[in-house]
C-alpha cells in the first residue's frame, strides 16, 4: 500500500504518545515527515529525549525538532503524576547519540510546509504551543495546512480540571489562537477518546505481536491513566486512527472557543453543538468511535 497522506506530528511523549507515534510511523497510509516535541506531559527536554529514544528503538531516521519549553503565557503544569517522572516509565531504552534538529519546532514545521508540493496535515497530540507559534510568526503557512487533527478538549467533563482537558488546559492561550486561526480542525476530545479503551485481554496480547508490542505493554503497565486490570484509554492514538480510518468516527461540525480567563474554567473548550452562540463552525468534533480495537491490532502488527 502506498502512503497517501503526508503528516507532521507534534507530540509530548508521554506513554500514550508512544503508541500514537508507533501508529504514525507504521500505518501504511501515512507518510510521517517530521516529529516535533512540546512541553506537556513532562518538560520539553524529557519529551524530546523520549521521542528520540523511540525513533532509535525503531531505527527511524524521521527528523525531530524540539519545541516550546513553556506555554505562551503560563508556567508549565505537567502530567508526571500520570506518565512517571521521565514521561515514559516502565521500559529501559538503549542509549543513543542522536540529537534534535538545530531549528526550533515551529520553524522546522514552517520549512517542511513551505517546501511541500501540496498542503500537509498537522497532527497535534500535546499542548498547542508550537502550532500557535507557527501561526503567530508565519500566518502565511495556514494556506499550506490541509487540516489540523488534534487530541484535546471536551464538550463535557475535563481530565485535568473539572471542565478542562489536559492538552488545552496547559496552554489555553495557544489553543484559543489556533481555534481562531481559520484552519480546518478535527478535534478528537475526551468525548471520543474516553471510548477508546483497550481491554486487559487486548493489552496482554501485545507482547506476542513484536518488539513494539512488548515495549508498549511494559509502558502501559506503568501508565496511571487506567491500568492493566481495568483497561487503558488511548487518547492520543485516536487522532491517528481518524487519519487512517475516518469512517470509524462520527463527527459534528460546531463552533469551539477556549476559555482563557476563568478562575475555575480556564482551558475549558466551549463546544456549541446546537449553535446557540450564532457563530460559524470552526471545527469538526469527534463524538463516537466504533471498531477502534480492531484497527489498533492491525496497525501495531505493521511495526517491528
From Swiss-Prot:
Keyword Hydrolase tagged: yes
Family annotation (InterPro entries): Inosine/uridine_hydrolase_dom (IPR001910), IUNH (IPR023186), Nucleosid_hydro_RihC_nonspecif (IPR022976), Ribo_hydro-like (IPR036452)
Top EC group: hydrolase
Gene Ontology CC entries for this record: cytosol
Keywords: Glycosidase, Hydrolase
Function (record text): Hydrolyzes both purine and pyrimidine ribonucleosides with a broad-substrate specificity.
The family this protein is said to belong to: Belongs to the IUNH family. RihC subfamily.
Protein name stated in the entry: Non-specific ribonucleoside hydrolase RihC
Amino acid at each position: 500500500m502506498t502512503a497517501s497522506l503526508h503528516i507532521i506530528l507534534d507530540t509530548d511523549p508521554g506513554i500514550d504518545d508512544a503508541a500514537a507515534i508507533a501508529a504514525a510511523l507504521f500505518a501504511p497510509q501515512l507518510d510521517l515527515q517530521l516529529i516535533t516535541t512540546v512541553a506537556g506531559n513532562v518538560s520539553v527536554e524529557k519529551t524530546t529525549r523520549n521521542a528520540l529514544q523511540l525513533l532509535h528503538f525503531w531505527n527511524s531516521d524521521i527528523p525531530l525538532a524540539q519545541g516550546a519549553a513553556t506555554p505562551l503565557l503560563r508556567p508549565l503544569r505537567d502530567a508526571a503524576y500520570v506518565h512517571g517522572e521521565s514521561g515514559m516509565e516502565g521500559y529501559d531504552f538503549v542509549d543513543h547519540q542522536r540529537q534534535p534538529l538545530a531549528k526550533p519546532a515551529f520553524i522546522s514545521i514552517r520549512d517542511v510546509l513551505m517546501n511541500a508540493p501540496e498542503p500537509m496535515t498537522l497532527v497535534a497530540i500535546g499542548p498547542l504551543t508550537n502550532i500557535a507559534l507557527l501561526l503567530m510568526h508565519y500566518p502565511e503557512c495556514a494556506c499550506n495546512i490541509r487540516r489540523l487533527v488534534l487530541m484535546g478538549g471536551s464538550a463535557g467533563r475535563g481530565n485535568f480540571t473539572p471542565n478542562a482537558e489536559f492538552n488545552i488546559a496547559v496552554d489555553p492561550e495557544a489553543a484559543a489562537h489556533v481555534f481562531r486561526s481559520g484552519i480546518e480542525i478535527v478535534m478528537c476530545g475526551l468525548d471520543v477518546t474516553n471510548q477508546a479503551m483497550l481491554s486487559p485481554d487486548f493489552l496482554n496480547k501485545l507482547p506476542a505481536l513484536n518488539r513494539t508490542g512488548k515495549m508498549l505493554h511494559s509502558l502501559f503497565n506503568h501508565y496511571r491513566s487506567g491500568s492493566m486490570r481495568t483497561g487503558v484509554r488511548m487518547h492520543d492514538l485516536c487522532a491517528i486512527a481518524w487519519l487512517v480510518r475516518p469512517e470509524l468516527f462520527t463527527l459534528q461540525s460546531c463552533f469551539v472557543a477556549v476559555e482563557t480567563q476563568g478562575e475555575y474554567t480556564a482551558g475549558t473548550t466551549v463546544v456549541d453543538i446546537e449553535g446557540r452562540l450564532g457563530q460559524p463552525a470552526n471545527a469538526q468534533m469527534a463524538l463516537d468511535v466504533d471498531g477502534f480495537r480492531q484497527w489498533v491490532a492491525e496497525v501495531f502488527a505493521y511495526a517491528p
